[in-house]
């Protein structure tokens, strides 16, 4: 599909392809642009390519071909990528929290990218702590600031993950299946909270989901993926039965039957610290 004009975009993907070891094609010749302040849902079955596309936007996955360009320039391995990662926050399905630490300590890790390695070994300044407390308040967890994360419910843990992302003061949030492990009521609350905050702050959000009902309820734009490529890109109101059949019935005929859907990603230590 032809991407939207870069003048209207904070991120642009041009002819991106990702092939994992073993010949597994996770993404093929994909082009798309993401507009400022838009809440976009990447919709599709497991293995459709949505997580690979999402992670490619922050170079958690290294493309086999093509390019990703932000307002800072093409994202390779230099300063443009470092600056892009600083302004791009991640929210993960399994929280990626330090369970024995408090909610506040976890949210403060969102501030580490603003300090050099030596400074991050010591308690962060009061200003950072105030930012972290404010972020916890925004997700309704001010009273849980000093509670250990492993004592919180799954929904509360995911809200800590959102607060950590907000502490990074991002221009972009990438959320990879953020409600896959939550019950329906909690999922609606978490997605509604995330969408409202992104709208209030003008944050561009790109969220991968497999649940159609959530895409219809929360998305400004739905990008449907099947067989490692984009097959739909429009407002959720434009989804037809035929298009849904294509998104949800798409099966790869080129990948081995026992190939992993989208292999796990090992994060670089520097990126792990910056989250």
Swiss-Prot record:
Pfam families: ABC_tran. Gene3D superfamilies: P-loop containing nucleotide triphosphate hydrolases. GO terms for molecular function: ABC-type phosphonate transporter activity; ATP binding; ATP hydrolysis activity. The keyword Protease does not apply. It is an enzyme of class 7 (translocase). It is found in: Cell inner membrane. PANTHER family: AMINO ACID IMPORT ATP-BINDING PROTEIN, PHOSPHONATES IMPORT ATP-BINDING PROTEIN PHNC. Belongs to the ABC transporter superfamily. Phosphonates importer (TC 3.A.1.9.1) family. Part of the ABC transporter complex PtxABC involved in phosphite import. Responsible for energy coupling to the transport system. This is Phosphite import ATP-binding protein PxtA. The gene is ptxA.
């Amino acid at each position: 599909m032809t991407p939207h004009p870069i003048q209207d975009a904070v991120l642009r993907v041009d002819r991106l392809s990702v092939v994992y070891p073993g010949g597994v094609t996770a993404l093929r010749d994909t082009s798309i642009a993401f507009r400022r302040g838009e809440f976009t849902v990447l919709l599709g079955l497991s293995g459709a390519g949505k997580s690979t596309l999402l992670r490619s936007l922050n170079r958690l996955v290294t493309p086999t071909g093509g390019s990703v360009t932000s307002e800072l320039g093409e994202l390779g391995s230099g300063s443009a990528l470092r600056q892009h990662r600083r302004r791009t926050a991640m929210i993960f399905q399994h929280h990626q929290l330090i369970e024995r630490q408090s909610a506040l300590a976890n949210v403060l890790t969102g501030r580490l990218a603003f300090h050099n390695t030596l400074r991050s070994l010591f308690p962060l300044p009061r200003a950072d702590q105030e930012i972290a407390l404010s972020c916890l308040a925004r997700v309704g967890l001010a009273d849980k600031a000093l509670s250990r994360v492993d004592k919180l419910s799954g929904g509360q843990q995911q809200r800590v993950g959102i607060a950590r992302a907000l502490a990074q003061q991002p221009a972009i949030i990438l959320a990879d299946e953020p409600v896959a492990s939550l019950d329906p009521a909690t999922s609606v609350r978490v997605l509604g909270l995330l969408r409202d905050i992104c709208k209030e702050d003008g944050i561009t959000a790109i969220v991968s989901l497999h649940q159609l009902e959530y895409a219809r309820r929360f998305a400004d734009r739905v990008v449907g993926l099947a067989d490692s490529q984009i097959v739909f890109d429009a407002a959720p109101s434009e989804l037809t039965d035929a298009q849904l059949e294509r998104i949800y019935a798409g099966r790869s005929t080129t990948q081995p039957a026992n190939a992993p859907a989208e292999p796990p990603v090992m994060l670089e230590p520097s990126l792990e610290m910056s989250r």
